[in-house]
From Swiss-Prot:
Major enzyme class: lyase
GO molecular function terms attached to this record: 3-dehydroquinate dehydratase activity
Family per record: Belongs to the type-II 3-dehydroquinase family.
Catalytic machinery residues: 28 (proton acceptor), 106 (proton donor)
HAMAP family per the UniProt record, alphabetical: AroQ
InterPro entries named among the record's database cross-references: DHquinase_II (IPR001874), DHquinase_II_CS (IPR018509), DHquinase_II_sf (IPR036441)
Keyword terms: Amino-acid biosynthesis, Aromatic amino acid biosynthesis, Lyase
Pathway recorded for this protein: Metabolic intermediate biosynthesis; chorismate biosynthesis; chorismate from D-erythrose 4-phosphate and phosphoenolpyruvate: step 3/7
Protein name in the entry: 3-dehydroquinate dehydratase
Gene3D superfamilies per record: Dehydroquinase, class II
Quaternary assembly: Homododecamer.
Length: 163
């Protein structure tokens, strides 16, 4: 399955998300980036998808990942650009340029925080934005992306059926 790019989704995490579990746990919780990646891989697998998870503190690396997704023909992108969501026109332009279905994710509710976090450039390039659900937002994002791209799951393992 990993050889089929049309079954692959990229899960891209931006700056400081490597510090999950220790950075501001009152805001971001105690789950680590490894926990997030495990959740994404497990959720994607339920839909017959392969989640390829990456994290970078560097804007250009994230832009390169978006470009690579187009070249490889991946099915979709889950993006938590962290603070770059609020500042990066480069990420916005990259997402607009590749035309790959994208869901923006934020662990915290960015609209209930500082005013500078209320605006997201990357959200304008995504078909959906999910915030405030903790790391469960990644599961919700993959579920929504799977529906958007027509990936299906067996009802015995369907995470939405278990809710």
């Amino acid at each position: 399955m990993a050889d089929d790019p049309h079954k692959t989704i990229y899960v891209l995490n931006g700056p400081n998300l490597n510090l999950l579990g220790t950075r501001e746990p009152e805001t971001y919780g105690h789950a680590t980036l490894a926990d997030v990646e495990r959740l994404c891989v497990e959720t994607a697998t339920r839909f017959g998808l392969v989640a390829e998870c990456r994290q970078s503190n560097h804007e250009g690396v994230l832009v390169d990942c978006v470009h690579e997704a187009r070249v490889k023909g991946v099915a979709g992108i889950i993006l938590n650009a962290g603070a770059y969501s609020h500042t990066s026109i480069a990420l916005h332009d990259a997402l607009m340029g590749v035309k790959i279905p994208t869901v923006e994710v934020h662990i915290s509710n960015i609209h209930a925080r500082e005013s500078f976090r209320h605006h997201s450039f990357t959200a304008k390039a995504a078909f959906a934005s999910i915030c405030g659900f903790g790391i469960d937002g990644y599961r919700l994002a993959i579920t929504g992306l799977a529906a958007k791209i027509g990936a299906t799951t067996d009802t015995k393992t369907d995470i939405t059926a278990q809710a």
